[in-house]
């Protein structure tokens, strides 16, 4: 069994997986780094819920874009599971014949995991993969599995927090779905601005990218804010909320030469 760990700027995901199935995922906030012992407390809860044994865990793969949290995750793996974990990085793209044609190969490990999963789930397609996390990252992958371009924009939570941070009187609001656009109180007006502003930004960016690329792009959304698009008919073809974890699982199977690769 695999423990897949996705460390993002806003949340950490712990997932317990078999070779072809994600059994359980929990999310915790990542704003403040914790100790290996504290992270084990959360992970131990999942293992107990699944009624499985620690001995069944034979691999741990970590995708992390927060260096300060990577260290306790390494300690967690070694101290509690006696496993030297695999740290997902750009070198793993070669295993899947994925080429990174970006300056300085500037691609986060979470986004690479997304691309690994998307290229396996939707093969032989020109893909636009949108990671809707702390930042909103649009990555382009062609049929030849070359990552050749990207757009990076603020995430919905950054939009919400920035209004409070850079103004004297505006309150802090949450990111939440809104049925209407115009409101008569400041809280709902701000929530509407964040929600509909984010929806409009993403839809507009997709439209501009497709127009500029002049090709039929299969559009996939993933990440913590992708749920905002569940009720909207947009150019997004598929919403894959756990694409990063699936990418880590594909890597696990590839490194293990596991025949379950195509059934995730």
Swiss-Prot record:
Substrate binds at residues 108-111. The active site is at residue 110. Keywords: ATP-binding, Coenzyme A biosynthesis, Cytoplasm, Kinase, Nucleotide-binding, Potassium, Transferase. It catalyses: (R)-pantothenate + ATP = (R)-4'-phosphopantothenate + ADP + H(+). Its EC number is 2.7.1.33. It is found in: Cytoplasm. It comes from the Bacteria. SUPFAM superfamilies: Actin-like ATPase domain (SSF53067). GO terms for cellular component: cytoplasm. Pathway: Cofactor biosynthesis; coenzyme A biosynthesis; CoA from (R)-pantothenate: step 1/5. Its cofactor is NH4(+); K(+). InterPro entries: ATPase_NBD, Type_III_PanK. ATP binds at residues 6-13, 134. It is an enzyme of class 2 (transferase). A monovalent cation. Ammonium or potassium. GO terms for biological process: coenzyme A biosynthetic process. One of its GO terms (molecular function) is pantothenate kinase activity. HAMAP family: Pantothen_kinase_3 (MF_01274). Homodimer. Catalyzes the phosphorylation of pantothenate (Pan), the first step in CoA biosynthesis. Belongs to the type III pantothenate kinase family. This is Type III pantothenate kinase. It comes from Ehrlichia canis (strain Jake).
